[in-house]
């Protein structure tokens, strides 16, 4: 079984994703990056692009992003759009 982390993707008034994920790929200012379980802690702005979530059950979901911010800490990631 793949290692997971808790991921929340939200925008004002709406949770788009809230659950266990294997990976999330996000568009950052310096290029696309992927967060996985036990990733180093950081905060970074996000740019226009697509977020791709690989859920613990193996499904993949995508979300269009105009801009936002991602925070990773203590095996949790929060993406605010």
Located regions from the model:
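Compact, glycine-rich, soluble single-domain proteins
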Residues: 2-81
């Amino acid at each position: 079984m793949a290692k997971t982390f808790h991921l929340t993707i939200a925008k004002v008034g709406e949770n788009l994703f809230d659950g266990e994920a294997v990976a999330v790929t996000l568009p950052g200012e310096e290029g696309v990056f992927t967060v996985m379980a036990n990733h180093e802690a950081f905060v970074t702005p996000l740019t226009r692009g697509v977020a791709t979530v690989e859920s613990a059950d193996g499904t993949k979901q995508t979300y269009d992003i105009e801009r936002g911010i991602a925070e990773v800490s203590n095996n949790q990631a929060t993406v605010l759009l």
